[in-house]
Regions:
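N-terminal cofactor/phosphate-binding cores enriched in small/glycine residues
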Residues: 57-152, 168-187, 191, 195
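Beta-propeller blade signature
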Residues: 178, 238-250, 315-329, 383, ...
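Extracytoplasmic beta-rich repeat domains
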Residues: 80-100, 130-159, 191-214, 256-286, ...
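A structural motif specific to WD40 beta-propellers
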Residues: 77, 126-130, 186, 252-253, ...
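Repeat-blade elements of multi-bladed beta-propeller folds
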Residues: 48-52, 93-116, 141-174, 207-233, ...
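Blade/loop signatures of beta-propeller domains
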Residues: 39-79, 257-264, 432-456, 558
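Bacterial N-terminal signal peptides
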Residues: 23-34
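Phosphate/diphosphate-binding loops
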Residues: 351-399
Length: 673
């Protein structure tokens, strides 16, 4: 997991060249479009009952009480404080409040970074209950975040407690089942309301195998992935996807993206001995559920470690892939690998988005996957064929002994959301002549051949950097207009391979204040990584460093892009804040009111943009960093619409720490309809 922190369609032969659509696909797609299936709604028919708004992950709300015409009057309605500020927590420097609440059964449910689950009144923000699973706060965890919870209700009337349940994962790798009404553990689930997710797995470091995203729910199944601490070693924990019975907690199926035997569907593409001594390939982001086709869509990350692959040669099939699994059995239905032999930490972090995409005038059930490379891919949902051409293109080779970078990578024909070319010395930017001079020297010294340049001992410039592109914040989908909206990072990063001796020297020095280090034990090289910054700590490339981008899928074009975030709080006192566009963590949501709401940027504002033009219409300063994805719902006798965001800051990004959940609404008289 990253720490930092239709004109013409074509398919692609895995590992091969671009080709035309397979015979008969148009007829098959026409049939699929003509017979849409109705998806089950969230228990309680709530407006935002899933982390991604709905099971499809569209992050789109049909609410329009707040709209272009009145959003300027939006104001805080209530604020709740969780009390989680890191006291007594050994990993307090990593605390990141990324929670998106869900609305179900008349309550808002959310989870703090230390896995305290809380139920709130949606109108007032008053606490209804809270449950603390008491994770070991003295343990050092690889991550310290939790993005949300999932809800479930028995399909048949049942007596007693826990008919309606909240499921949540924890930093110490437990799956919790809580009574949605009281917050008490469901005694009939696992052992006293929890399942130990480490059972049956190879655990090298208990603090580095975690759950940071809400599980997927399909019928009576709860499906969970894992986050695994990056770059410790080659032989780390494996990213097994598992399903449990929502009532009893009994294990029902497991799917390991990495082959463990010759019968595994990816075995032919791996050296099995290497596969067995490799880890990760995990799904740490949010999965999506396709009830119509009975699928769970699973985005996976890199095999371990991220920046040296000499001991995991080949494409590393099923790592860095979009997997479509049969939700009932865990059987692989189809897969598309979007990064071959990852050497850049380009995990598939964004939630897959399910919806209809227009193809030759017909709506086709599709899955849209945004990536940290800044590329968007669109596949037909039931069989996984590309709906926009995907082409294998040659990319730079490795100069490192023992490394075999894959010679091609799959490029989408949709316009990229982030630049892919090399950063040139003449691109150097800075506030002073000295800044620009030092940045030119830095750029000239690095290996730098554009996207997919392999890591090197001289240092490699990554464009996009290892935070994206599009990270876990994902995308919002306005299906009626065929628009995908994403918060995008554009800041280049530097990765350097180090000998073990050089690693020990550098990690003990004070010369790398902006750097992260990883030992990558079991390989010849450790790694160091950092943003491309001048000696003053300013970016070496011109702004924007973060944007909000809208892609028009009907016309295969960028509809608009706007800088996301200002330099407020990050510039000397004598310089004015500028709307340059800043690095961001968190995602957008879209509404039928013609608005896109997004926090994410480092300056701590929640913003509203016009969904048609990208113009900023409103912003409000949050009490702490808003590195989370907002949500919206209606509640109360007047069905007042609220927009809610968690504001607690992001440890690795260094934004203001806090413990706030803030709701915004129109003044009551204006909210009435």
């Amino acid at each position: 997991m990253t720490g930092y922190a239709l004109k013409s369609r074509a398919g692609v032969v895995p590992g091969g060249r671009c080709r035309g659509r397979a015979p008969g696909i148009v007829a098959a797609l026409s049939l699929a479009a003509a017979t849409p299936g109705a998806l089950p709604q969230t228990p309680g028919s709530s407006d935002w009952g899933y982390y991604g708004g709905d099971a499809l992950g569209q992050r789109f709300s049909s609410l329009d009480q707040i709209n272009r015409g009145n959003v300027a009057r939006l104001a805080p309605a209530w604020t709740y404080r969780t009390g989680e500020l890191g006291a007594g927590f050994a990993s307090a420097g990593k605390l990141t409040f990324e929670a998106t609440p869900v609305l179900a059964f008349g309550r808002l449910y959310l989870e703090t970074a230390t896995n305290v689950v809380i139920a709130l009144d949606p109108e007032s923000g008053r606490e209804r209950w809270r449950f603390d699973p008491h994770i070991d706060r003295a343990r050092r965890y690889a991550q310290a975040s939790a993005r949300g919870v999932s809800v479930w209700a028995a399909s048949e009337p049942a007596d007693g407690v826990c008919r309606r349940r909240i499921f949540a994962g924890t930093l110490d790798a437990r799956l919790l089942a809580l009574d949605a009404d009281t917050g008490r553990p469901c005694s009939d689930f696992g052992a006293g309301g929890e399942v130990d997710l480490t059972r049956g797995l190879r655990i090298r470091d208990a603090g580095a195998f975690l759950v940071t995203s809400p599980p997927a729910v399909f019928g009576k199944l709860v499906i969970v992935g894992s986050a695994i601490g990056d770059n410790r070693a080659a032989d780390v924990e494996r990213g097994v996807i598992r399903a449990y019975d929502a009532q009893s907690g009994a294990p029902l199926w497991a799917f390991d993206p990495l082959p463990d035997s010759a019968s595994h569907p990816a075995a032919a593409d791996w050296n099995l001995a290497q596969a067995q001594s490799t880890g990760a390939g995990n799904s740490w982001g949010v999965m999506s559920v396709d009830h119509e086709h009975g699928l769970v869509l699973v985005p996976t990350g890199s095999a371990s470690p991220d920046y040296y692959g000499g001991q995991r040669l080949g494409t590393n099939r099923f790592a860095n892939s979009l997997l479509a699994l049969d939700a009932r059995s865990g059987r692989l239905v189809w897969q598309q690998q979007l990064i071959h032999h990852d050497l850049w930490d380009y995990d598939l972090a964004a939630q897959p988005v399910l919806g209809d995409v227009e193809v030759e005038g017909l709506p086709v059930p599709a899955v849209i996957q945004a990536t940290q490379t800044g590329m968007l891919y669109v596949f037909e949902r039931s069989r996984g064929q590309p709906l926009f051409p995907v082409m294998e293109r040659r990319v730079p080779s490795s100069h490192i002994a023992g490394e075999q970078a894959w010679p091609t990578q799959p490029f989408s024909s949709l316009p990229p959301l982030a630049p892919q070319r090399a950063v040139l010395a003449e691109d150097a930017w800075g506030l002073t002549v000295w800044d620009r001079y030092e940045c030119r020297k830095l750029i000239a010294a690095l290996r730098n051949e554009g996207i997919f340049t392999p890591p090197d001992t001289r240092g490699t410039l990554l464009t996009p950097g290892y935070i994206g592109g599009v990270n876990w914040g994902g995308t919002a989908f306005d299906q009626d207009h065929g628009r995908i909206i994403a918060a995008v990072n554009l800041l280049p990063m530097v990765v350097t391979l180090l000998t073990p001796a050089e690693y020990e020297r550098q990690v003990r020095s004070a010369d790398y204040p902006h750097s992260q280090f990883g030992r990558q034990a079991g390989t010849p090289y450790a790694m160091r990584r950092e943003p491309l910054l001048s000696p003053w700590g300013l970016p070496c490339t011109a702004p924007p460093w973060g944007t909000l981008v809208s892609v028009d899928l009907r016309h295969n074009r960028i509809a608009w892009q706007s800088p996301l975030g200002s330099t407020e709080g990050f510039t000397p006192w004598f310089l004015p804040a500028r709307e340059f566009g800043m690095p961001n963590m968190g995602g957008p949501i879209a509404t039928a009111g013609g608005l896109v709401f997004v926090g994410a940027a480092m300056d701590g504002y929640l913003r509203a943009f016009d969904i048609e033009t990208g113009a900023e219409l409103w912003k409000h300063k949050l009490p702490a960093g808003g590195q989370a994805t907002p949500m919206t719902y209606r509640a109360g006798a007047t069905q007042r619409q609220y927009v809610v965001i968690s504001a607690g800051g992001h440890g690795p990004l260094g934004t203001t720490r806090g413990d706030y959940v803030t709701a915004f609404a129109l003044p009551p008289a204006r909210a009435a309809r």
